[in-house]
Amino acid sequence: MSTVKPLKTKNTDYINILVLCLCVTAVFFVAWTFTGQWPWKSQPYNSYILQAQSWLEGRLDLGRDYPYLELAIFNNKYYVSFPQFPSYAMLPFVLIGWNSCDSMIAFAVSLLGAVYAFKILKHFDIESKTAIFFTLLLTVGSNWLMTAQNAWVWFIAQNMAFTLSLMAIYYALKNKIGLSLAFWACAVGCRPFQILYLPALLYLIYNAHKAVNPEDKIIDIIKKRYLTLVPMAVIALSYMILNFARFGHITEFGHNYLPEFTRSELGQFNIGYMAENLKNMFSVPETQNGIWQYPYANGMCIFLVSPIFISYLVYIARSIIKHEKFDMKFMILVLTIAIIELLSITVHKTMGGAHFGNRYTNDVLPIIFIGTVMLLPKDNDWESFNYPLFFIGLAINLVGSIMFFVQ
């Protein structure tokens, strides 16, 4: 499937979007009945709310220690140790006194991510029922379900990065450079490794622009559209200013000052962590008396918890075996980005800490998704092999995440 597609307007498929949102909400509802993680519930791990409150009080640090949160300690002050964009999103609500807005924001962001995945599929004229199915495969049929259920500080940033990355991809396809790169900058402000998506976005933007301006060269695109980069630049500059004001360096957002890492012999990132983390990334759980002993920390087999990885590899093989015409350059670009990001996260000390599944690898799902969508055949053949993958992903993540939250 080609990345080059003339822009055209369509009536929004409101009914199918509503059905999709109801399907996602139904899965959440089942989980919430067991876990009590309802979207109107105040969350204890609310670092981003505390940070927004501190900013509104005129303070960059939190004012005191919260021992149950992962806080950076710098010059005897306590700071949120995660990238700051989620607090940006919460500022308006905290300003009006809604200090438990994070849970509802997490729910809304989850649904928005599903909607934009659906919109990406519809951009390529995928039939609506198929589009709903593949959106569900990406979302509730993957380990996204673990991080999308509530607003704990470790999860809501990943949830936001997932949605913002999909939005960046969608607007790149639609030749909306300003929106695409602005949402990409927001995603980087949630999960820094999303910076790796930039080459893919620029490739999509270039092809979308050339579809309507075939004579333009790269320099022509820059001359015509450089002002669209302003929102992205403003967002990036805000990160740099905050980082410098707090930690004296434009790229330091605080994680290196977590006691967990300052006390570690190898620090936060080290190639010495890679072997064990790679093993966890592809290992199925051990068994005891025939019962799988699912781990609740530091990851497990990505093909079990996010079967869309299998789907993507199968569609690559199918396209090659059938000698179909597809965008080889983009396929290589997607694979390169995914591999680099997966390898990058394996040099991190914790691989996600306490959770079910392999949540760090969720950051790769949006790029794998667009790679899969570009390879979907028009005649829907081979679609049925995804059905058991979806049910395996849904069942494992639903049961596993429920057990994690009720422990």
Regions found by a protein language model. Give the residues of each.
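Membrane-proximal envelope and lipid/glycan-remodeling enzymes
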Residues: 1-407
